[in-house]
Amino acid sequence: MADGLNRVHYNPSTAQLVEFALLRGEGELTANGALVAKTGTRTGRSPGDRFIVKEDSSAADIEWGPVNQAFEPGAFEGLWARVEAFLADKELFVSDLEVGADPEHYQPVRVTTQYAWHQLFARNLFIIPEEFNRQDKPVWQIINAPDFVCVPERDGTNSDAAVILNFAERKVLLAGLKYAGEMKKSMFSVQNFLLPAQGVLPMHCSANVGKDGDTTLFFGLSGTGKTTLSADPKRFLIGDDEHGWAPGGVFNIEGGCYAKCIDLSQKNEPVIWDAIRFGTVLENVVMDEHRVPNYKDSSLTENTRAAYPLEHIAQRKEDNRGAEPHAVVFLTCDVSGVLPPVSILSKEQAAYHFLSGYTAKVGSTEIGSTSAIQSTFSTCFGAPFFPRPAGVYAELLMKRIESFGSQVYLVNTGWTGGPHGIGKRFDIPTTRAIVDAIVSGELKNVETVHLETLNLAVPVAVPGVDTNLLNPVNTWSDKALYAEYAQKLAEAFTKNFAKYQVSDAIRNAGPKA
């Protein structure tokens, strides 16, 4: 993009970007030094406004539909040109960054933003390389123009805003949106398309590693505990949201964290609490009159966020990489109160539950979501971000689990003793005790009890956890009502899974309706 008429700031520092954001009225400084920015009416992702350009090089490999909406190449060219013209006289911020902390599987990306705080977000969440693009790969381009207003009749969009990915031209266009999470999820979608062709499984998961080099992965939708549980004071963080699993190891796709802030406390989440300081972007967080963030305030949105670089975490894996995982945890938030707090899965059950992605939308990251909690099935624990058919990712997961011998667990961070509104949610200390037992290997080869309707193996004891909690029927006062809810959940699983073409071994690994 030309910089003759406008001022362009290349690879600006954190301090410069904070100064620019404050001078330009884009945000305010909090008492803890973070920058607060508001995103207007769109306080989450806009899935109805996300498109992929339908062109010959990638069209046959994409699962088109409501998640991956098609956009015409000609319409994209016109809209890209109009956005470039709109930005031609604007002050801009540009950085050369990378996505993928692996010397073979990274993607170089040039990020151009209209807002200073969006550039700070990109530099926090993507990777700032010591040497840009060492392998001289073709460079992706992101343009983020939040003040551009799309016109559906002219631009071919669904509303006044759009997120459009173009694999042939290696371009990502964000127009009319202030919510910064769209930038990170766009490049995640890019890697989710590119990595399988390289034999790498892209994953919507967090990852950490112990002192002995043992890696654990945590899959789950927003709000199920990925970030909280991976930020473990006893372990070293690899990353909190996006990873690749290649033969030989896992790597972070990002260079930062995007942690949910609602009800954040120093006691329960000390690692995240301490990471929020100068350089952090707080999105839609409300402050009091003394500029102290009020993390309990959801008046703007439940989806309040902190975006900070991994350098803000003391206990982290500095190269953002780890060995192949000994333990893989699927986090589910069960609103029916039926699932046990932990189950031990066979590889066929792992494939079944990976494809199912059963959980709940808790403080959903999508616009239009309310604080109401509803159950959902999200393929691969991240359906909105995976362009290829689900089977591609499930096959890669099975291959990686089989070749390395990883043990997979299903951990319920949702309700017990009754559904949401009647039962109570598992507290963080209980889930942490379960995770501690998983990562220490204490749940390998233990005695289990089989839950027939759910078709799950549940350990009879977990160190530090009340034994009565382990079999969910024990926590319900009305046992007949539990059986009824369990049957309903099994039927929901079976109905959802009918769309998948899989082996009988995988299909039979699910609940028994």
From Swiss-Prot:
Mn(2+) binds at K185, H204, D241. The keyword Ribonucleoprotein does not apply. GO terms for cellular component: cytosol. SUPFAM superfamilies: PEP carboxykinase N-terminal domain, PEP carboxykinase-like. Its cofactor is Mn(2+). GO terms for biological process: gluconeogenesis. Pathway: Carbohydrate biosynthesis; gluconeogenesis. Its EC number is 4.1.1.49. It is an enzyme of class 4 (lyase). Signal peptide: none annotated. Belongs to the phosphoenolpyruvate carboxykinase (ATP) family. This is Phosphoenolpyruvate carboxykinase (ATP).
